[in-house]
UniProtKB/Swiss-Prot annotation:
PANTHER family: ACETYL-COENZYME A CARBOXYLASE CARBOXYL TRANSFERASE SUBUNIT BETA, CHLOROPLASTIC (PTHR42995:SF5)
EC class (word): transferase
GO biological process: fatty acid biosynthetic process; malonyl-CoA biosynthetic process
Swiss-Prot/TrEMBL keywords: ATP-binding, Cytoplasm, Fatty acid biosynthesis, Fatty acid metabolism, Lipid biosynthesis, Lipid metabolism, Nucleotide-binding, Transferase
The protein's name in its UniProt record: Acetyl-coenzyme A carboxylase carboxyl transferase subunit beta
EC nos: 2.1.3.15
Occurrences of domain CoA carboxyltransferase N-terminal (ranges): 18-275
Pfam families for this protein: Carboxyl_trans (PF01039)
UniProt family annotation: Belongs to the AccD/PCCB family.
Amino acid sequence: MLKDIFGKKKYATITLYKDNAGPAVPSNTHSSKSNGNPVSEMKENKRMGARSRIAALIDKDTFIEYDSELESCNPLSFPKYAEKILAAMETSMEKDAVITGEGTIRGESCVLCVMNPDFMMGSMGSVVGEKITRAIEKAIEKKLPVIIFCASGGARMQEGILSLMQMAKTSAALGRLGEAGLLYISVLTDPTTGGVTASFAMLGDIIIAEPGALIGFAGPRVIEQTIRQKLPEGFQRSEFLLEKGFIDQIVSRKDMRNTLASLLRIHRLGGEMHA
């Protein structure tokens, strides 16, 4: 499968699925900002809402959402945080910044976590960490692979150390997933930064990125202000990270469903051969 470990294209193109049949919208979709028209959001330069992304990936009527009732509180009584949560709920029509569940992609079962950039820029607080951890634990229980679509500005500052703790919690859960011999695919979208990059985003067995996605810890402006130097053109973009070996493959949105289905199938068939 490895084509050129020192080149920009580390994986050969997988063409197990060649048809152009489109996915259907999951039966539990919301009418909201984060669930726009999946077709209109397939353009690479437009950030994609979580519901639209699920609609573009998951087979019709197969998505079962986990923990949809969980919502953020204000554990540290951070000023105006409660108001920001309510505003984010109203604009996104979601309770927090990640949707988790299970379904099939071209018949291949998986647990899917999709971060929602429409909710406080996908920042990771206690609810995000808890939902992702529970989803991973469910995958271990059901012996299913995990796919996480990352889109985040980082840890949610209004929750302080409780937010930072989610980095360790999600990473530990992924460690248990690996010990169980299960696949984890991380998909990095624009932007993937901060504490999410420093935890589960970069722990995938296979790390995929969308074209042109901003991926890093601190943002480019912060780095430039700190080191007082101009960064190279394209620094922290997915193409730069592929060239430097930090990610495995860049996949466009139109090819994402087929690529993920093929990887899931290869892993499943490989597991069956060694069972």
